[in-house]
Amino acid sequence: MVTTYLLFIVAYLLGSIPFALVVGKIGYGIDIREHGSGNLGGTNTFRTLGKKAGFIVTIADILKGTLATSLPMVFGLDIHPLWFGLAAVLGHVYPIFAKFRGGKAVATSAGVLLCYSPVVFAILAVVFFTLLFTTRYVSLSSMVTAVVAVIASIVSGDKIFIIAMCLLAGMVIYKHRANIGRIINKTEPKANFSKKQK
């Protein structure tokens, strides 16, 4: 039992590592919270620091979810791995290492799925990038993909999977509530795939 509680804490702390903040400060001398949307996630990193930093942060944020979700399997615990994944996403959104001001749950949630169900992860990746290249809205693509994740979990019939996806989708949509208003008002920034970045 003690090991279980400790691993939940480890999962949360893994999620709390603010890679966008670390990369910005160490690699560029910039506090990314003071630039762009102020969000500690991949999208703001891409827009503020460029493609290289954006890819590094996004991959690192994905791995946080993957590593946390794998903890019960690595340590032989008979506990559903998605609970640990949820702890990591909670850490990503409300990181103790960055005054509880983190990202929007997308990349770390993707990492949770990558570990738990690579097939669903692959399907959602196709959905996300199809929407992204069609609409050029990262936020809209993220929210719609989150809803599709819930549908996929319902189709699977796995009750814990359904609960976890509902919680993650709710968190993703909640963290994008300001984006929803900007999309409606047509003031939401679009991804610019042709623009040269650092």
Curated annotation (Swiss-Prot):
Query: Pathway, according to UniProt?
Result: Lipid metabolism; phospholipid metabolism
Task: Give the source's domain of life in one word.
Answer: Bacteria
Give the enzyme's main class according to its UniProt record, as a single word.
transferase
Q: Which GO terms describe its biological process?
A: phospholipid biosynthetic process
- Per the record, the major location class is membrane
Membrane topology (UniProt): Multi-pass membrane protein
- Where, subcellularly, is it found? Cell membrane
Which InterPro entries would you find in this protein's record? G3P_acylTferase_PlsY (IPR003811)
Hydrolase keyword on record: no
Q: Which UniProt keywords apply?
A: Cell membrane, Lipid biosynthesis, Lipid metabolism, Membrane, Phospholipid biosynthesis, Phospholipid metabolism, Transferase, Transmembrane, Transmembrane helix
- Output the Gene Ontology terms for molecular function: acyl-phosphate glycerol-3-phosphate acyltransferase activity
Recorded GO cellular component terms are: plasma membrane
Pfam families hit by this protein: G3P_acyltransf (PF02660)
Q: Does the keyword Metal-binding apply?
A: no
Transmembrane portions of the chain: 4-24, 71-91, 113-133, 147-167
What is stated as this protein's family in its record? Belongs to the PlsY family.
Record's subunit section? Probably interacts with PlsX.
Function of the protein = Catalyzes the transfer of an acyl group from acyl-phosphate (acyl-PO(4)) to glycerol-3-phosphate (G3P) to form lysophosphatidic acid (LPA). This enzyme utilizes acyl-phosphate as fatty acyl donor, but not acyl-CoA or acyl-ACP.
Q: Kindly provide the name given to this protein in its UniProt entry.
A: Glycerol-3-phosphate acyltransferase 2
Q: Which organism is it from?
A: Bacillus cereus (strain ZK / E33L)
Q: What is the lineage of its organism?
A: Bacteria, Bacillati, Bacillota, Bacilli, Bacillales
